[in-house]
Amino acid sequence: GAVMAHELNKKGKKCLVIDRREHIAGNIYCEDVEGIHVHKYGAHIFHTSNKNVWEYMNQFAEFNNYINSPIAIYKDELYNLPFNMNTFSKMWGIRTPQEAKDIIAKQVAETKITEPANLEEQALSLAGKDVYEKLVKGYTEKQWGRDCRDLPAFIIKRLPFRFSYDNNYFNYQLGALEYRSVRFET
């Protein structure tokens, strides 16, 4: 909405942007608190593989180089996310993608789940018991406040799962953490 309104306004059109929230700009909205620009919904991680989009956005904001590479903790052990070869190497002491695929395939086959009915079954049928127990179950139940067996299966399909040693959460060529924010004016 904001981009469309901006572009139409540049062409002399008047625009009315309506948002269901009490403000415009969606999740990149910032509040001015005593002269400090506060990101209401958290830091803005911008990522794209489209160079034109990257150049367009750089007209409005300053970005710091940033790679999102989260870490999960399970029983005092650190695991890289998204699930990748660093994760599997730490978990199973292996080195190659084929070794990881073989372990996952064996664990998935052991579940005998053909039509997952909930998130737990979906995760087990995709990643096997070890990944589910160590890296999915606790986090998911904390995030949603519900048992994984009470959550729909589709939720787990959006987790990145890779067989490389790349710890970058996003598969985009261009990514950054917003340094100086876009200002939206009404």
Question: What annotation goes with each model-predicted range?
Answer:
Residues 77-79, 86-186:
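Active-site/ligand-binding neighborhood in enzyme catalytic cores
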Residues 9-34:
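Glycine-rich FAD pyrophosphate-binding loop
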Residues 18-20, 48-49, 182:
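Short His-Asn-centered micro-motif
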